[in-house]
């Protein structure tokens, strides 16, 4: 079993990795800098998983307020008392409050990522795009490709009014 170092990014010992014998994998993550754009249903689950890895930094970006419908689309269960007490809290602040208990490298950004500020993400190891606005996703995708940023687009961005156009057909990011 590997001994935990003082530079551990977790706020308490990661006994899961040693139990599974995968400490060697953790070394591959130690210098990674991850950005998660959007903390809706998909983005919050990405954060839930990434926060349990020893990546150096996790930056979360979202300018939306955590609302009742988000409680049904996020990991865990939010109490009705907490929903009422934290009414109007930003998504990034809500999730930071939870996941910073475990991971010391989380930074919350209460803003949208746009073409005007996307260059701030040029030095990230990986960027997860998990937003529901197709035009913004398309623009960010093009920007990341142009900057050479490694990204994963995981949002679906399907609205009921669009279903007739999308039903039984393939969607392409090509112009």
Task: Name each region found by the language model.
Residues 1-32:
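Glycine/serine-rich phosphate-binding loop and adjoining beta1-alpha1 elements at the start
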Residues 22-65:
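Glycine-rich adenosine-cofactor-binding loop
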Residues 36-40, 61-63, 110-111, 129-132, ...:
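Short His-Asn-centered micro-motif
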Residues 47-48, 72-73, 139-142:
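Short amphipathic alpha-helical segments
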Residues 57, 105-107, 150:
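Conserved beta-strand segments of alpha/beta enzyme cores
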Residues 63-103:
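Glycine-rich phosphate-binding loop and adjoining beta1-alpha1-beta2 segment
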Residues 90-126, 131-138:
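A structured beta-alpha segment of the ubiquitous adenosine-cofactor-binding alpha/beta core
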Residues 123-175:
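E1/E1-like adenylate-forming module used to activate ubiquitin-like modifiers
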């Amino acid at each position: 079993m590997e001994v935990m170092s003082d530079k551990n990014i977790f706020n308490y010992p990661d006994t899961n990795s040693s139990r599974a014998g995968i400490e060697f994998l953790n070394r591959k993550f130690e210098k990674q800098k991850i950005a998660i754009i959007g903390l809706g249903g998909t983005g919050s689950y990405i954060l839930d998983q990434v926060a349990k890895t020893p990546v150096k930094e996790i930056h979360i970006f979202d300018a939306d307020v955590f609302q009742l419908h988000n409680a049904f689309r996020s990991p865990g269960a939010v109490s009705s008392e907490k929903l009422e007490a934290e009414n109007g809290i930003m998504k990034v602040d809500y999730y930071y409050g939870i996941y910073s208990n475990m991971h010391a490298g989380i930074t919350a950004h209460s803003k949208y990522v746009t073409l005007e500020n996307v260059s701030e993400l040029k030095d990230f190891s990986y960027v997860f795009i998990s937003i529901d606005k197709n035009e913004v996703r398309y623009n960010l995708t093009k920007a990341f490709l142009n900057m050479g940023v490694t990204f994963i687009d995981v949002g679906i961005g399907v609205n009921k009014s669009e279903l007739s156009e999308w039903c039984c057909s393939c969607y392409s990011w090509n112009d």
